[in-house]
């Protein structure tokens, strides 16, 4: 081989390797950004998970409050139903749902 041909071959190989290096650096930067986004998605998923853990107790509390209202009839909510004199003074207010109290039921070891 002529030294000029070897030189041109090595030069084209060098250009090719520089192009591959540039593409590799770009890919590395994109993968680093993707890694950050996946980590952020993981953190956000943990937050959503902790919120969703409470939904069972929230729905249970709403259900209990709703069930406590079922003991009253439609007449209990009518205007003037308390002024007929047949009810004590304490019952002259319209019936309200039971007061809900928040109680932490999580184990101390989970926190």
From Swiss-Prot:
Q: Does the keyword Ion transport apply?
A: no
Q: Which UniProt keywords apply?
A: Cell cycle, Cell division, Centromere, Chromosome, Chromosome partition, Coiled coil, Cytoplasm, Cytoskeleton, Kinetochore, Microtubule, Mitosis, Nucleus
Record's GO cellular component terms = cytoplasm; DASH complex; microtubule; mitotic spindle midzone; mitotic spindle pole body
Protein location: Nucleus; Cytoplasm, Cytoskeleton, Spindle; Chromosome, Centromere, Kinetochore
The domain of life is: Eukaryota
Give disulfide pairs as residue numbers. Answer: none
InterPro entries, from UniProt?
A: DASH_Dad2
Q: Where is this region: Disordered?
A: 80-111
Q: Which Pfam families match?
A: DASH_Dad2
Q: Write out the GO MF terms.
A: microtubule plus-end binding
The function of this protein is: Component of the DASH complex that connects microtubules with kinetochores and couples microtubule depolymerisation to chromosome movement; it is involved in retrieving kinetochores to the spindle poles before their re-orientation on the spindle in early mitosis and allows microtubule depolymerization to pull chromosomes apart and resist detachment during anaphase.
- Which PANTHER family does this one have? DASH COMPLEX SUBUNIT DAD2 (PTHR28036:SF1)
Which protein family is it in?
Belongs to the DASH complex DAD2 family.
The record's note on quaternary structure and interaction partners says: Component of the DASH complex consisting of ASK1, DAD1, DAD2, DAD3, DAD4, DAM1, DUO1, HSK3, SPC19 and SPC34, with a stoichiometry of one copy of each subunit per complex. Multiple DASH complexes oligomerize to form a ring that encircles spindle microtubules and organizes the rod-like NDC80 complexes of the outer kinetochore. DASH complex oligomerization strengthens microtubule attachments. On cytoplasmic microtubules, DASH complexes appear to form patches instead of rings.
This protein's name = DASH complex subunit DAD2
